[in-house]
Amino acid sequence: MSLIPYALTRPFLFGMDPESAHDLTMNLMAKGQNTLLQQAWAQPMVSDPVELAGLKFPNRVGMAAGLDKNARCIDALAAMGFGFVEVGTVTPRPQPGNPKPRMFRIPERNALINRLGFNNEGLDAFLSNVKRSQARAQGKPMLLGLNIGKNATTPIEDATSDYLKALDGVYPHADYVTVNISSPNTKNLRALQSDEALDALLGAIAERREQLATQHGKRVPVFVKIAPDLDEEQVGVIAATLQRHGMDGVIATNTTISREAVKGLPYAQETGGLSGAPVLEASNQVIRQLRSALGSRYPIIGVGGILSGEDAVSKIRAGADVVQIYSGLIYRGPALVPETARAIAQLR
């Protein structure tokens, strides 16, 4: 149980602009991890083990990518009781992302809009931070996913080279790797979800992964993260392509470009990806379609709109094997982690 209830700190954080609040929180967590200060946000680890893609997850609730883009707070996040933590998205070269302001809260709907644009310090800094994790060095029961993307300045036709460079770098340090082709905030990135582009990209990744498995003596699972803004035919094409190239699983979904659920509210028309409560059903629908297309045994990580134990259970019932949270952590705080983990565990 964290020493400082989130209900006390949230008004202070929500009094700041979203990116300043995010940066302050991440800096405090980075400095406070593995010290007594960590008790301010620590939560119990709920035991609900499951095996997926050859990995043993301590429980079925993970931290989604995007919060910790530079892998600075792995140990701090592990202390919140997550069964797995995904950091990134990292690109081969450092990049500043899109101009500010680029994050917006819509508290009336428990939602966020961001157009950050893969702002990160680049692969070298990212890997240095991963290697510094004490939780990893001590073998604590938490899996680590490393999420990779392309640089904004890399032409879309050369995107594969960026993904392969990033894969080469993260492979030895990851429990699993996520290929992010679904952020709406990098120009043309979602075009990689189309049939021919996805086929070419995943073919190259599959080939490189086999080379890396031989080189490093281990086969690291590769997941692909997709958007919620897809029709059933597109989902079917993606599912077939994932299986054809031996991808180990899919993460559904990223943020949405739809604004139906927040129409008329302040900041609703800001460009970027919408996350939080309004994405829940759209994400669940894609999960249901994926489960139908992929069969009962293919690994699906469900993410999007989880703000309660009930929301997490809805993802599992839609067909997800495990889930991730992000916006819910902003609105509900660290106590959401054990709440969702316990709710899912009760399904057994």
UniProtKB/Swiss-Prot annotation:
A GO term, aspect molecular function: dihydroorotate dehydrogenase (quinone) activity
Membrane topology annotation: Peripheral membrane protein
GO annotation terms (biological process): 'de novo' pyrimidine nucleobase biosynthetic process; 'de novo' UMP biosynthetic process
Record's catalysed reaction(s): (S)-dihydroorotate + a quinone = orotate + a quinol
Catalytic residue list: S183
UniProt superkingdom: Bacteria
Chief subcellular location: membrane
Keywords: Cell membrane, Flavoprotein, FMN, Membrane, Oxidoreductase, Pyrimidine biosynthesis
A GO CC annotation given for this chain: plasma membrane
Pfam families with a match to the protein in the record: DHO_dh
Cofactor(s) needed by this chain: FMN
Cellular compartments annotated: Cell membrane
Binding site for FMN: A65, G66, L67, D68, K69, T89, N147, N180, K225, T253, G276, G305, Y326, S327
Pathway given in the UniProt record: Pyrimidine metabolism; UMP biosynthesis via de novo pathway; orotate from (S)-dihydroorotate (quinone route): step 1/1
Family: Belongs to the dihydroorotate dehydrogenase family. Type 2 subfamily.
Protein name (Swiss-Prot/TrEMBL): Dihydroorotate dehydrogenase (quinone)
Annotated organism of origin: Delftia acidovorans (strain DSM 14801 / SPH-1)
